[in-house]
Structure formats: structure tokens, C-alpha cells
Amino acid sequence: MLYILNSATLPLKPGKEYVIHAKELTIEEAKELLENERFISAVGHEATAKMLTNIFDVEIPMNRIQIFLDDGDKLLSIILKTRLEEGKVIKTVEELEQIGYNIWLFEVVTYEHNVKYE
């Protein structure tokens, strides 16, 4: 499954071991991915969801859910270039452009069950 998230957090299950492939995408590459694959939004703020909808020309609904990645799952993540002040929410594409962001695609390529750490 492809998920879209507005943070750099990788939602991994505790106690598991992962190998993740990461690739930075252009806006065009991200648009193509969202147009061609089913995805679930895990974007937790309405203003951010609207902003991402404008950037990608694909409807990104606000959907404040908790997700965990499994084998083969992909995560499209919008990562700000600067950490925001506490409580600050970006409300416009212009604000986002001013702060700057990168688009990353993370894919779980190996997911080990029942890993024991020593």
C-alpha cells in the first residue's frame, strides 16, 4: 500500500527489523505515483491536506490515522527543510515554498517478523 504523510516520521512497528529503500522525488514523479497507485492519506491537518492537493493536483484528504509499514508498503513523505516553531501550522502553498521541502519515497523492502535483539 502507498501512504502519504506530511512528516519525516517512519511509522514502524516496535520490535521488528526493517530494510527501507529511500529515494528523493521531484513533484512530477510524486504526481505520477499518486495518479497511478491507490494510496491512503495519513495527513493529519486540513490545511496541509489542501496544500498537498494543490501541489500534486490529486485529492489528498485530511485523515488523522495511525499507520504502520509492512512488507512492500511505500510512504510518500513531505519533509520540511526547517523545523517549525511549536504549534505552527503551515496554511498556504506560499508558506511551504518559503520554508522549503523535499519529497521522499520510502519503501519497505525487507520486514523481519519476531526479531530478537541481544
Swiss-Prot record:
Organism: Sulfolobus islandicus filamentous virus (isolate Iceland/Hveragerdi)
Domain of life: Viruses
Protein name: Uncharacterized protein 26
InterPro entries: STIV_B116-like, STIV_B116-like_sf
